[in-house]
Amino acid sequence: MLRSSITQSRQLLLSPARSRTASQWLPRAGASNRISGQRFFADVKPPVVPGAPTPASPSSDTPIPPETVPKSTLADEATLPPPPPPPPAPVRKTGRFRRFLIYLILTSGFAYGGGIFLAMKSDNFHDFFTEYVPYGEDCVLYFEERDFYRRFPNTLRNANRAPKDEGNKVTIPSKSGLSWKVAEEESGADLSAKGPHMSAVEQKGDEAQIKPGTAKPEEKVAAVEKAKSDKPVKEEAPKDTTKVQEEPRKPAVPAVTPIEFATVNEGDEAVVQELVKTFNDIITVIGADESAHKFSGTIIKAKDELQKIGEKIIAIRDEARNAAQEEIKEAHATFDESARELIRRFEEARASDAAQYREEFELEREKLAHAYQEKIRTELLRAQEVAEQRLQNELVEQAIELNRKYLHEVKDLVEREREGRLSKLNELTTNVTELEKLTTDWKEVIDTNLKTQQLQVAVDAVRSVLERSTVPRPFVRELVAVKELAAEDPVVEAAIASINPTAYQRGIPSTAQIIERFRRVADEVRKASLLPEDAGIASHAASLVLSKVMFKKDAVAGSDDVESILIRTESLLEEGNIDAAAREMNTLKGWAKILSKDWLGDVRRVLEVKQALEVIETEARLQCLRVE
């Protein structure tokens, strides 16, 4: 309300000035526009007429040359009619829908961008974003592909490469190559002897390979179809022992005797085992080749050398172990001799130290005995002196006591003589003293009552400022007066310290303002009451629309929904129970509690101020009761 009134007053004050300024500057603006529309050239010299005035020199006071001043324009200005008034300004469109659409697009873009960035950094958020956000999975997949292509730029280059030209296809007949049956090796077969396996000449026949250069396309197709139609021969289990087994087919290439792996009997060393493993890997590679028989002699020699190397390593290890055992024995003997020598030296040092300590102990004992004797002698002398001094003091005290008794007796005699005349004077002095004491006590009572009344008046002033103000007003001066009047009261100081500085510096709202603001907050809370905790933009829009058509219901005592809490709070505010209303609003949860947080802060400051004033008034009454 205050802001709207200030804005209206500013508009009213500024509108006449603006109209006057616009009307004054319109003709001048038209003239300047006309002048600015013309072109002038400073480098063109006007014709010099005889008798014309000479131009001003640089030393004269004229800052602008007269040649550059357009005379005809000023003459025409008086003859021109006044410009028409400007047309009224068109009504400016608010463009709320356009702004809403732009904000929605920007917000969605920022939200999707941040979501995609977090999804690429966190696996948990990646699952949530791709599962619950529309088009989230496509966006994340697109950026992941871009990141992959950025890291591996050669991927697309290899994928787009043209396939290689393999030339003519090579077809392998169906029955060429090795067979699944193992060929029976004849006794006494020698791989080094000449035979069909040693010949490099190709056999002629139907099973020979078709050369890729001479084969026709029809033959290639027929060979491929034939290879596909052939199936592996399945071995049938013999049902009857009397049937003759099928004779196995001989393989095209004879079987090669595998080379045995190298083994070292005493190869428990890691180096030997690693060497044997490497050698066996070499044997495996050679055995997989068809020309393994060529390296059989070399492999056998290498195995013998490997066996010798293993034996040498074992021998070297045994020699090193024996040498180490001898060195260990010698070291043990040396250590034993050193230990015995060390023990002997230790015993000698301990004996010498014991003798030295014994001598030092005797010297110290004699010193201590002498010191104690001197101390006892000194204590005896001091005790004797103290006893003599105590005796002298007792004698002096007795003399003083005798003098005191003598003076008391003399005083008693004098008092008896003055009893008759001074008795009434003593009574009068006593009465005057009691009267002075009573006057002092009553003065303190009056001062206390006056201070209590002033404190009550200051508290009433603070309360009147809070109750009569229609807008929040600061009450710093009134609160300072209360603090000065109760400077030595810890209760009042604690109550003032409990008030938030913002409350007395800016003021607190009245009850009517609290109720009015509650109604505005209640509308916003009703709009957000249908929102879940993880609501999106669509949920906000749906909640805003549904809040317009919601019906208000009656408050239920045990209900904890938002509408019931708002109705109970409103009824409590109308009854004047602000504390209970704040407690009701504090039970809200989620968006409703976030929206009502500022209202609860204002109510809390109001309650703090009221509670502090009640405490100060109670303390003032308690002081009055204490005085009575």
From Swiss-Prot:
Subcellular location: Mitochondrion inner membrane
UniProt keyword Cell inner membrane, yes or no: no
Membrane topology: Single-pass membrane protein
Residues in the Mitochondrial matrix compartment per record: 42-99
Composition skew (Basic and acidic residues), residue ranges: 216-250
Coiled coil: 301-444
Entry GO terms, CC: MICOS complex
UniProt keyword Cell cycle present: no
Compositional bias segments (type: Pro residues): 47-56, 80-90
Region span, Disordered: 1-30, 44-92, 183-252
Quaternary structure annotation from Swiss-Prot or TrEMBL: Component of the mitochondrial contact site and cristae organizing system (MICOS) complex.
Protein's recorded name: MICOS complex subunit mic60
Organism of provenance: Aspergillus clavatus (strain ATCC 1007 / CBS 513.65 / DSM 816 / NCTC 3887 / NRRL 1 / QM 1276 / 107)
Native organism taxonomy: Eukaryota, Fungi, Dikarya, Ascomycota, Pezizomycotina
